[in-house]
Amino acid sequence: MLEIIYQDEHIVAVNKPAGWLVHRSWLDRNETVFVMQTVRDQIGQHVYTVHRLDRPTSGVLLMALSSDVARMLSLQFEQHQIQKTYHAVVRGYVLEGGTVDYAMAEELDKIADKFAKSDKAPQPSVSHYEALAQVEVPLAIGRYETARYSLVALKPETGRKHQLRRHMAHIRHPIIGDSTHGDLRQNRGVAQHFGCSRLMLHASHLHLNHPVTGEALTLTARWDEPWQGLMSQFGWSGIAPHLERVEFPLTASQDNE
């Protein structure tokens, strides 16, 4: 069973585990575990997706319980009326907050976007980040005798594919566990020495107005066991107590894309 963090007669939100696909995809015919089907079976009714999380990303996933509500929520996302807050562990010291305003060309999938045009102009892309904690560990990865990491809060202003992963890599603080845009040596080092191989990107909060009642909602998804384990080893326990504690009884294959 998935952790349901909010449910009423119109919407449902769950804490999506890292490694889970949101829905069935012909790109991965061998996968058998999906968020939509699991939630549908769990609550006994059809659900409608209104946004997505990449497979290796965990956290708040909001779904509608009717097509009408799905349209209303989709419009809120399109008009940037819903605010998202993520947390990430990145390479290096991030000592203060800032904004990444860096236009990005569309990132095409070799299979899914085989026939898509590859000459589109870069799209405006803006992300905000906040420094929360830093650590230096006596671990020689690469040319240095120690390794430095930071915990950051991220708030995307736009919603491009892999935006946060690409923006943090652009400012030389790639997200740990990102095999596409990250530092592969750091990824291996963290996996080998700290036992954490997942992408360290988590959708912690969604702030929105309820599509039917207008009530202001803040949906919060807490960290899973691997994430919390790394927080403990880095001495970061207690920095965000409202996000600590949750275990997923079901397992799914990890895929860092």
From Swiss-Prot:
Query: What positions belong to coiled-coil segments?
Result: none
Q: Which GO terms describe its molecular function?
A: pseudouridine synthase activity; RNA binding; tRNA pseudouridine(65) synthase activity
Enzyme active site: D54
Q: Domain of life of the organism in this record? A: Bacteria
Q: What catalytic reaction does the record list?
A: uridine(65) in tRNA = pseudouridine(65) in tRNA
Which SUPFAM superfamilies does this one have?
Pseudouridine synthase
One example of a Gene Ontology biological process annotation: enzyme-directed rRNA pseudouridine synthesis
**Which UniProt keywords are given for this protein, alphabetically ordered?**
Isomerase, tRNA processing
Show the disulfide pairing: none
Q: What is its EC number?
A: 5.4.99.26
Q: Which CDD domains match?
A: PseudoU_synth_TruC
Q: Does the keyword tRNA processing apply?
A: yes
This molecule's function is given as: Responsible for synthesis of pseudouridine from uracil-65 in transfer RNAs.
Concerning its family, UniProt says: Belongs to the pseudouridine synthase RluA family.
Q: What is this protein called?
A: tRNA pseudouridine synthase C
- Its source organism is Yersinia pestis
